[in-house]
Regions:
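Cytosolic nucleotide-utilizing catalytic cores of signal-transduction proteins
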Residues: 1-140
Length: 140
């Protein structure tokens, strides 16, 4: 980087599943626009995760394209995940407290979190991912 006088910025996009060809193009375009906006307005960070960038865009009232709709679809399609997100948010990501609030065994909770992670690419044990999903639920 220093040898060539350039600055690199790396964006770790989300892992998407169950998308048709047209949806994949829309999601890619939305992520590309999100990344471009981030570099233009806040290009001082060199690495940024998908959820952190999405939270930044939501706080700045920027357009996220089809991203919120797709993530919300994953939330709605996953049994109990909306309740899990709310309970995890209330218990500050503490899995034991979340399981107790939901009257669920901790291993069952972990299984549902892993299943949602595989489907949506978002790890709800990560506070940025959890906050993004929580905001999507709050905003309907």
């Amino acid at each position: 980087e220093n040898d060539f006088g350039t600055k690199l910025t790396i964006f770790f996009g989300n892992s998407w599943t169950k998308l048709q060809a047209e949806e994949l193009r829309q999601v890619f375009d939305s992520e590309y626009q999100l990344f471009s906006d981030f570099v233009r307005f806040k290009g001082n960070e060199q690495t940024i995760s998908f959820a952190k960038m999405a939270l930044w865009a939501r706080s700045g009232q920027l357009n996220l394209g089809v991203i919120p709709e797709k993530i919300r679809h994953y939330i709605d399609d996953s049994k109990d995940i909306a309740d899990i997100i709310e309970a995890m948010w209330a218990s500050q990501t503490n899995l034991v407290q979340t399981a107790q609030k939901l009257f669920m065994h901790r291993n069952s909770l972990q299984y549902k979190l892993d299943k949602f992670h595989g489907l949506s690419g978002l790890n709800l044990k990560n506070l940025d991912d959890l906050a993004f999903c929580h905001l999507l639920i709050l905003n309907g």
